[in-house]
Amino acid sequence: MLRAEKTSPWRGAYEFTVDGAPVSSFSSHWWRSGGRMTIDGRDHEIRAGRWGGTYTMTDTTDGADRVVATAERVARKHWTVTADGRSYRFRRASMWSSEQLLVEGEQAIGSIRKLSWWRGGAEAELPGLSLPVQLFVVAVVLSMWEQQSAAASGGGG
């Protein structure tokens, strides 16, 4: 089971573990969606498109900027991730839930859910996805949740 736990209540920094063993960390940008992470000693940058619906993870080690994965239509009911020569489909569990489901056909085969409404973080079970792609998917979902939380608290009027 992949877990992302927030390391500070004031920053968008997360520690990723698989079955309790540390595998990476993710530091989100405070001024825009996305962030940085290191996976198996390689540096990766996650960038959001202009309107936040598309995210791309690139391997930036040695200035290569090789695209590893892309997520499209994020924050919509249905969205996709393309990586490792495949497309993975996700959908929101329900209108009232933040949980995201990995689907094959109409069957849910995996999920990403919040650990806590107050502390943030996520827990994911994403069978069939490589570890780098799992980390990307969870980082994208964390960024989406942070954006939604910021928008909900912004209000005013």
Task: Give each language-model segment a name.
Residues M1-G157:
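Intrinsically disordered, low-complexity proline/glycine-rich segments
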